Regions:
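Catalytic cores of nucleic-acid endonucleases
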Residues: 80, 85-135
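Acidic-basic catalytic patches of nuclease active cores, encompassing PD-(D/E)XK
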Residues: 2-69, 74
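Short, charged, solvent-exposed linker or helix-capping segments at domain edges/interfaces
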Residues: 73-77, 157-160
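Non-catalytic C-terminal interaction segments of nucleic acid-processing enzymes
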Residues: 1-11, 16-19, 128-173
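Flexible, glycine-rich phosphate/dinucleotide-binding loops
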Residues: 72, 116, 142
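Short hydrophobic-acidic sequence motifs that mark active-site Asp/Glu residues
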Residues: 60, 64, 79-84
Length: 173
């Protein structure tokens, strides 16, 4: 598989659904950008993925990454991680990340430290549903992996196959 490759999924920009004054606020987008840069420079050393990954019936993940699986000759097989970033509303992020667990081997909620501390009080919810909880401080470029679920099969293997096909076609794998 490739070393590191980010791809554009050319998904519909959901910010267009918002009023003009709200649609220009880019806090969450900036947070996601900082998180993506950190992941690609410090966490992942190989794989392919990108921002705003739409999968029909499962929503649009803020960020997905396909990691190569050991001993698998086909580049389209591997481990799929999906991430949902939010600045405040951890409950909404949890709902979305849980939905991504249908096509991902692991899905994560990523929050800034302050809302992350609030979400930590409900850590048992994340553990029960195997949804990861990470906090990220963009100013300090510090990632805290509060809970990382064990790698497991997605809840819907056919949905994963479809997701991997979309990534493979966009990434020319």
């Amino acid at each position: 598989m490739l070393k590191l490759k980010t791809i554009r999924f050319n998904a519909y920009n959901t910010r267009r659904n918002l009023p003009a004054d709200t649609g220009r606020k880019r806090g969450e987008s900036n947070f996601l950008g900082a998180f993506e840069r950190y992941l690609l420079s410090s966490v992942y050393t190989c794989g392919v993925g990108g921002r705003y990954f739409p999968l029909s019936n499962y929503g649009m993940a803020d960020f997905v990454w396909l990691l190569p699986a050991e001993r698998k000759a086909n580049a389209t097989q591997g481990y799929l991680h999906s991430f949902e970033t939010k600045l405040h509303d951890w409950r909404r992020a949890f709902q979305q990340a849980y939905r991504y667990s249908y096509f991902s081997d692991a899905s994560f909620v990523v929050l800034p430290p302050t809302p992350g501390a609030v979400a930590e009080k409900y850590l048992s919810l994340f553990q029960t549903h195997s949804v990861g909880l990470w906090t990220f401080d963009p100013q300090a470029s510090k990632l805290n992996q509060v809970f990382t679920p064990e790698m497991s099969a997605p809840r819907n293997p056919e949905a994963k196959k479809k997701a991997v096909q979309v990534i493979a076609s966009r990434g020319n794998l």
